[in-house]
Amino acid sequence: DISQWPVHKNSAAIVASIGNDKPLRYNTDMSYVFVPPGQKKIDVALVEYPDESDKGPYPVPENVPIEGWPAWFTRDADQKLTLEDVQRDKANQGGDRHAIVVDPFAGKLYEFYQLKRTDQASGGRKAPETRWQCACAAIFDLNSNKLRPDGWTSTDAAGLPIYPAVIRYDEFKAGR
């Protein structure tokens, strides 16, 4: 609980510049995963925006969290969904299904829109080597401010990464 922590000395000016009367929505359940050096890279089928996706392979680990995991998917005790159930969209909830993978050793950020674990490639072809699919995949160089090509989408639909906007507890604690 951070509600009793002191606010930034310029908090009032920051809030005023954004607009004190405007609604603020934030995701409390945007999970991400850091991968170790040498994380195996795999193919992910690009099923909706292949021409605006960065080509793989990608370092997607078996435990990659899907947006909402675990908070959203474990709130209902009757549901009893596992991470793999969520990855496969067993409950047919659909949605944005963002997934964020950070490779700090290679300085790369991988973001996926509608990531889904599957045993089939698009079009119903059996493809055991294709275990994941997504609508869009974006790779960002963490050592650069380079943007995606003009007009390209990304996992946030604006060509920008999501991860820089994720607020982490350790950042709050450090006062950043």
Q: What residues fall within each predicted segment?
A:
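Short, surface-exposed polybasic-aromatic patches that bind anionic ligands, especially phosphate groups
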Residues: D1-R176
